Regions:
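…primarily DNA-binding HTH/wHTH and HhH modules…
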Residues: 160-191
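Regulatory, non-catalytic segments
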Residues: 134-149
């Protein structure tokens, strides 16, 4: 496995039929996921962007056992997802408490983890599920800032009119991931 140091985290690739993505860990915990083609690996001379757009370098060149184990675990988990063998993670499996999240973001991400693969909720519905019924716009901001897409499945959140809405650097990923999970656009409003 090709492991890179990025700021205070370590990065390793995971493979999919759509190309390689990157997983980031710090202190043995998942802190970032980049979808294939999303990061700076190919665009910046081999330096992944990292969970916060960081740069390669700094700190120990080799990860400790906890980081190495976490990189291997999460790379395999994401490869299993993209191979169709894994579709969801539970709140107990995702280290939200270690991700420097605010109370609101954590509540929203925990609620989102309960949305089954291939199903969608609107930003407003997710706000209600998280206990913030009037915070649909803030939920949209939390989705845009999600450091671990796919694991915290922000692609399952759509607009109330049934349209996809935005998604990272490439909005096509949202529908691609939903279809991968078995979702069908047939009968969707706004199509």
């Amino acid at each position: 496995m090709c492991i890179r140091r990025v700021d205070d985290a370590y990065a390793a690739p995971y493979q999919t039929v759509w190309g390689d993505g990157w997983v980031y860990v710090r202190d043995g915990r998942l802190v970032g996921v980049e979808l294939p083609g999303e990061g700076q690996i190919d665009r910046a001379g081999g330096s992944p962007g990292g969970p916060a757009g960081g740069r390669a370098g700094g700190g120990a060149a080799e990860p400790g056992a906890a980081d190495s184990d976490a990189l291997t675990f999460w790379a395999r988990e994401l490869e299993a997802y993209f191979a169709g063998a894994r579709t969801t993670w539970t709140a107990a499996e995702v280290p939200l408490e270690d991700m420097r999240l605010g109370v609101f973001e954590r509540a929203v991400y925990e609620a989102l983890l309960a949305v089954p693969a291939g199903e969608t909720v609107s930003y407003g519905e997710l706000a209600e599920m998280a206990g913030y019924p009037r915070a649909a716009r803030a939920v949209g901001n939390a989705m845009a800032e999600n450091p671990i897409p796919v694991v915290v499945p922000c692609h399952r959140v759509i607009r109330s009119d049934g349209t996809m809405g935005r998604y990272g650097n490439d909005p096509r990923w949202k529908e691609r991931l939903l279809v991968h999970e078995g979702w069908s656009a047939a009968g969707r409003e706004g199509s």
